[in-house]
A protein has these predicted regions:
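N-terminal helix-loop segment corresponding to the beta1-alpha1 unit
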Residues: 1-96
Length: 96
């Protein structure tokens, strides 16, 4: 059952805590948009065990959409801001 089917989650995430949290929300049916830097989440490059992709990355990011942006670019920041404003849930685990 997809309890969170109509919920939009936007997550600017890396490492473990936020990706694990948002993957659980995706498992429950939420639409999760993972915002990534241009070079991609560093976890993408840990290994190439799952059809050339990192097992860790695939496990923590299953069921998510990915939006690649440069947060230093004004236009990209505007896009992210608009998406966050339409989200039901916003997750981030960046340095304060």
């Amino acid at each position: 059952m997809n309890f969170l089917e109509n919920i939009l989650v936007v997550s600017i995430e890396q490492a473990v805590a936020a990706p694990l949290c948002s993957s659980r929300l995706a498992d429950a049916g939420a639409r999760v948009i993972k915002v990534e830097r241009e070079e991609g989440d560093f976890a993408r490059y840990y290994d190439k065990d799952v059809k050339g992709e990192s097992a860790y990355f695939v496990w923590l990011n299953r069921g998510k959409e990915s939006l690649v942006v440069n947060l230093k670019d004004k236009n990209d920041r505007s896009i992210v801001k608009n998406i966050i404003q339409s989200a039901d849930v916003y997750i981030q685990n960046l340095i304060p």
